């Protein structure tokens, strides 16, 4: 797989299938943790050679666009966006240089694959059944993988994630373990409304976590400190894709974001 960046389009599809199979094995081998809510913790999500290429072939800062939603409220006073993103869909990354495009095309295709989705659904069954009932496996899930970059000043207060989301996955992409203290924090909400910190993910190379979104999946991130240049990760979100409204919404958002992205490249 170390030749990913020079493969033809056909061979990239085959490489994506192989990468998806590796990710499925990582999901199947992940640790299941019950508290403060059911979640998975990953080690070695990607093969070592692919992970090394991902670090080497990160997009330039100008390739990213602002992340909206909760992140927008934490822009710096001068207007600098503390979280930016690139959607890892073919139509978004096609403007990247050929070597970078080839790699991130493989990564994006693998993350959006059916085997990876089914692996998450299988391993997150306790959380999904709690929300959707015994027929949780029949609930449609629409994957959206985005490469995110946070800079010092970024933070997000405790929240559960919107009900539009079914599964939240974050895969960390640091070069080393020098700043393991900036990982996502998990909380437990007590009867008095307080939300003490119960655990924190380590921001370590090639690690991550996943959970089925529910009304108890409280999580946050402390401000990224100045010892960090960037906090890079992949957010893989599975949006609930069940019913006409949600199906149209998910595809409409993808189309709308594509139009905005194309406009940005043309001005």
Predicted regions and their residues:
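A general structural signal for short secondary-structure boundary/capping elements
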Residues: 85-92, 192-194, 215-219, 254-259
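Short, mixed-charge, low-aromatic patches
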Residues: 6-13, 73-79, 124-128, 160, ...
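Short N-terminal signal/transit or membrane-insertion segments
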Residues: 1-26, 89-110, 145, 161-167, ...
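Residues that form generic nucleotide/phosphate-binding pockets
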Residues: 22, 26, 53, 57, ...
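Non-heme Fe(II)/2-oxoglutarate
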Residues: 29-123
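Catalytic core of non-heme Fe(II) oxygenases with the double-stranded beta-helix
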Residues: 100-236, 240-248
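Fe(II)/2-oxoglutarate
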Residues: 1-35, 250-267
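Amphipathic alpha-helical surface "interface" segments used
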Residues: 73-80, 140, 144-148, 255-261
């Amino acid at each position: 797989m170390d030749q990913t960046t020079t493969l033809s389009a056909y061979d990239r599809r085959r490489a994506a299938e192989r990468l998806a199979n590796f990710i499925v094995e990582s999901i199947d081998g992940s640790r299941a943790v019950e508290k403060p809510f059911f979640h998975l913790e990953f080690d070695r999500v990607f093969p070592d050679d692919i992970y090394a290429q991902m670090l080497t072939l990160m997009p330039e800062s100008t390739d990213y666009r602002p992340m909206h939603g909760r992140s927008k409220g934490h822009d710096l006073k001068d207007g600098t966006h503390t979280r930016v993103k690139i959607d890892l869909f073919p139509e978004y990354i096609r403007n990247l240089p050929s070597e970078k495009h080839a790699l991130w095309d493989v990564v994006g295709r693998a993350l959006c694959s059916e085997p990876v989705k089914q692996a998450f659904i299988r391993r997150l069954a306790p959380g999904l059944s709690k929300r959707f009932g015994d027929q949780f496996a029949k609930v449609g899930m629409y994957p959206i993988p985005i490469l995110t970059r946070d800079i010092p000043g970024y933070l997000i207060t405790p929240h559960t994630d919107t009900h539009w989301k079914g599964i939240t996955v974050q895969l960390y992409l640091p070069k080393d373990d020098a700043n393991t203290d900036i990982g996502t924090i998990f909380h437990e909400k007590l009867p008095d409304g307080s939300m003490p910190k119960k655990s924190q993910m380590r921001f370590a190379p090639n690690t991550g976590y996943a959970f089925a979104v529910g009304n108890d999946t409280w999580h946050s991130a402390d401000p990224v400190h100045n010892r960090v240049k960037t906090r890079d990760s992949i957010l893989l979100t599975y949006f609930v894709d069940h019913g006409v409204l949600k199906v149209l919404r998910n595809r409409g958002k993808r189309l709308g974001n594509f139009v905005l992205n194309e406009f940005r490249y043309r001005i």
